[in-house]
């Protein structure tokens, strides 16, 4: 599917001419096993990695180096008591985790994990399916997973899960727009929305370098999409316990937990496909022909997705949770305008290349550098003046309708009793508490 009127080279799509039903079945089973195995590995890597970053051992009892800890947790979830709230909408309560898990596992259907390989004498691409609008399929399925979260929060008829569901829906809407705009520049450069053709277009240069601003926007939006720190507001433990998962137990909770980590693998795979050359070998190994053929592609794909997985784990260990207003300001007032501005520049430069014979990486490197410099200048000069604080007319008493409340802007806080306490008075109070009879006699 050609998107632009420019003279974009037509890249070769995946060849499914020898595909059979049993090959498709084998690849579907392989994708499920691949995702579950990577989730188990991700749990171990995250816990050991966080322990290392926080100067503690992490899991080290269940198996060598704690490798079996994830299996122990899975067994615990399987045999936990299955409970639900009495007022819950029973059908939707059970359906919601299944929707979230189904949407998470469906994304990999159109992800090219390698070039054509030979299986039992049949040449087939390491991809379950491809279509001219495969990238739109990914965005649509990612949005479908939101229904599992919203229905799960609403069907429990409980306050905290509903808060988590509303937060999650606002978060996905805010950051999926910026993510979609960052991917449009990839479609313009590749001339297609087919994932296999996008990978083929990155045979020489990865879009992560040519379209660096779009790559950065995608990475930030991807973290918000999967509800990970510092954007885990739908599951903020200190505010709403576990968000939409608060009233779930046993394997229903396990499906939500599994879908969260599968979604991490999904956004990593999409980043690899759209910006990191897909299954192509990294430079300088890309110049060795046999390293870009056969089963080698699966190795490069695996290493690239784990590069992004490690970045998300590292981010969790490093950054604190954003405040909700900061989070929404970042999505709507920062990422969206930057993504739109970059998209306009990409379309403009794509048209200029029809008249100026310059390599894409040179032209976009210069334009991208100027774009980033302009953003830095705007950021440094955009210092809003603090608004004057109007003094409150009411006297601060420390209580409002019987509840303790903090002072409003302009009100003077009450003096703390501890601020005026003396050492003699403190010792006398402590002595009275230790010897109440003597204090009464006095």
Predicted regions and their residues:
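Selective transmembrane helix interface/packing segments
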Residues: 2-442
């Amino acid at each position: 599917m050609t998107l632009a009127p420019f003279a974009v080279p037509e890249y070769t799509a995946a060849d499914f001419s020898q595909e059979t039903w049993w090959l498709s079945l084998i690849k579907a089973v392989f994708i499920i096993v691949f995702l579950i195995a990577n989730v188990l590995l991700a749990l171990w890597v995250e816990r050991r990695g966080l322990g290392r970053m926080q100067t503690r051992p992490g899991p080290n009892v269940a198996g060598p180096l704690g490798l079996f800890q994830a299996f122990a947790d899975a067994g615990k979830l399987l045999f936990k008591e299955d409970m639900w709230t009495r007022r819950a909408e029973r059908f939707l309560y059970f359906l919601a985790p299944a929707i979230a898990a189904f949407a998470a596992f469906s994304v990999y259907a159109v992800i090219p994990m390698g070039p054509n390989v030979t299986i039992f004498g049949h040449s087939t691409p390491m991809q379950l399916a491809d279509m001219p609008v495969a990238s739109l399929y990914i965005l649509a399925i990612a949005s479908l997973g939101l229904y599992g979260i919203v229905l799960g929060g609403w069907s429990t008829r409980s306050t905290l899960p509903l808060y988590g569901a509303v937060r999650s829906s606002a978060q996905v809407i805010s950051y999926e727009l910026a993510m979609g705009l960052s991917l449009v520049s990839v479609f313009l450069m590749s001339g297609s929305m087919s994932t296999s053709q996008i990978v083929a277009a990155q045979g020489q240069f990865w879009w992560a370098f040519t379209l660096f601003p779009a790559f950065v926007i995608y990475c930030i939006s991807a973290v918000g999409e999967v509800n990970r720190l510092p954007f885990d507001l739908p599951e903020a433990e200190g505010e709403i316990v576990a968000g939409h998962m608060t009233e779930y137990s046993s394997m229903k909770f396990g499906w939500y937990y599994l879908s969260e980590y599968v979604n991490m693998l999904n956004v990593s795979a999409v980043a690899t496909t759209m910006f990191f050359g897909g299954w192509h070998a990294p430079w300088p190994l890309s110049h060795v022909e046999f390293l870009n053929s056969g089963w080698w592609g699966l190795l490069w794909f695996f290493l690239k997705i784990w590069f992004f997985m490690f970045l998300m784990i590292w981010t969790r260990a490093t950054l604190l949770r954003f405040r909700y207003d900061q989070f929404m300001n970042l999505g709507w007032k920062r990422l969206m305008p930057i993504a739109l501005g970059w998209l306009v520049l990409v379309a403009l430069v794509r048209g200029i290349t029809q008249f100026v014979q310059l390599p894409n990486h040179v032209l976009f490197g210069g334009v991208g550098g100027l774009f980033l410099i302009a953003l830095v200048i705007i950021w440094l000069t955009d210092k809003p003046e603090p608004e004057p604080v109007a003094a409150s007319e009411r006297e601060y008493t420390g209580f409002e309708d019987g509840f303790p409340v903090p002072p409003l802007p302009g009100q003077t806080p009450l003096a703390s009793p501890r601020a005026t306490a003396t050492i003699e008075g403190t010792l006398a109070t402590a002595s009275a508490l230790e010897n109440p009879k003597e204090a009464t006699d006095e």
